[in-house]
Amino acid sequence: MNGIIIKTPEEIEKMRELGRLVAEALDYIGQFVKPGVTTNEIDKLVYDYHVNVQGGYPAPLHYGNPPYPKSCCTSVNHVICHGIPDDKPLKEGDIINIDLTIKKDGFHGDSSRMFTVGKVSPIAQRLIDVTHASMMAGIEAVKPGATLGDVGYACQQVAENAGYSVVQEFCGHGIGRGFHEAPQVLHYGKKGQGPVLKPGMIFTVEPMINQGKRHLRILNDGWTVVTKDRSLSAQWEHEVLVTETGYEILTVSPATGKP
């Protein structure tokens, strides 16, 4: 199965719990996204909530090489992903993706959302909305017998039909006991290609969509990914379980009941 782990019913229950926890953390953190707040302040709140309220641990902290220095990723405006929290205050009109992953009892929960800082331009809001629609189109393609190419194709069609571009160098991933497991989930592709989906697979769908061209560069910190043309970028992320009949989103907001 290309190293893809099919989860047991017991593991699926744990992943439902972890998905709920990360969604609750995103619900909690949203209230603090406003002009004047720094992403470092948000990061400290994330650490405290994961550890002291939820009894877990932020999986990004010290992850990878070089070791990631913070508890979450905060990607503002032209930052595509892996933005490192810092002391720069958010300002009116900014858009920000907050990407959280909690680890607890040996399992992971991973989700990200876009937040707006005060009032944002209609141009920025459209990018946010289309990116969400791109993610949902990918998720809605998930069912037994479909392929990951079907998922990527669906994401890509929505984004490109709106005049945007899809980042190709970063992708979704399997998740469970591992933070990043097989398979890689591309957000572009051809129908019918790639691994076939089977019940019990759990992976993320998390398209990164740029207002301008898809090209990117990585900053000297080894983590922060930005658009090469400095255009805005947006991303949403959910965890998806392949069920016997279709899909189940594991990271729906408990506050709103909406994905």
What are these regions, as identified by a protein language model?
Residues 1-259:
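Active-site neighborhoods and metal-handling regions in enzymes and metal-associated proteins
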